[in-house]
Amino acid sequence: MIEAITTRRSIRKYKDKPVPKDVITEILQAGILAPSSKNRQPWKFIVAEGDAKAAACQAMENGLKREKQMPFIPESSPYINGAEHTLQIMRQVPVLIFIVNPLASSFSKALSMDERVSEICNSQSIGAAIENMTLE
């Protein structure tokens, strides 16, 4: 395990060939097996290829344009350039795996201390799933 952790690296140059379904399944299984706070498993995995991937990238581009023109979250402005760079990378990959938290609260909802702690724990659980997936 230490070898996998110490030799892990981010790849940002991709081959123009599809990822075999069994590889995608193994990556998803690694995420599913991650530990989660109170075993809530606060994740849904969405695999996007082809037209679905193109549509997801287009939706992100549209959202970034809207955010630049009229910020929904004004504090996000410094991060737009980074998100645009991420979008360029997303367009190059053969498959995208989105991880969403179906238990998350609305951005506009005021949270109690317990709800805030739960949100933090869910985010950490999703982080564990992502790490498992990248080590796979």
PLM regions: where:
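Glycine/small-residue-rich phosphate/adenosyl-binding loop
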Residues: I46-I126
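Specificity-determining recognition surfaces
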Residues: M1-I24
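Glycine-rich phosphate/pyrophosphate-binding beta-alpha loops
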Residues: P35-N39
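A generic alpha-helix structural signal
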Residues: I24-L28, C57-M60
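Short, intrinsically disordered, charge-balanced linker/junction segments flanking boundaries
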Residues: A129, M133-E136
